[in-house]
Amino acid sequence: MKAAIIYDSRTNTTEKAAGFIAEGLKKAGEIEVRCFNIDNVDFDYVTGVDMAIFGSPTYMASVTGKMKNWLEVNVRKLGLVGKLGGAFATEQYIHGGAENAIKEMLVFMMVMGMMVYSGGNSYGKPVIHLGPVGMSQNIEDFRELFVTYGERMGKQLLRKG
């Protein structure tokens, strides 16, 4: 199985979160995973994945304009219809709108025909309703949350298999 994590990152915080998720995916089993900044996506690789996870810093309680534009321009080229999808976000402030950013990406994926997943509260704590959120000032403190999310997403991908 193959997965891609595609993100925008201004200060490398969202990039670090993507790396944590990749750790979790690898813990789940035999999953090849690669992370891409939206400036350097390998379209050949991504068109062959079974799952795509998107991440964005939160800006004005939403995804960055750069991420929104990238999704609108590029997502059709990726052939993600029917593929598993998920989303995550980082933010600078508590209640900075990261859940709105995650919802925006999830809705976009659903409109494009992807099957979205998070695990919700079915696995117990940590409960990850829509997708993980980490504070940029201390992203390392959220490492385990992102790793857990990656592992849960990976297990779902392998079940879907």
Where are these regions (language model features)?
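FMN-binding flavodoxin-like domain, especially the glycine-rich phosphate-binding loop
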Residues: 2-3, 9, 13-16, 20-161
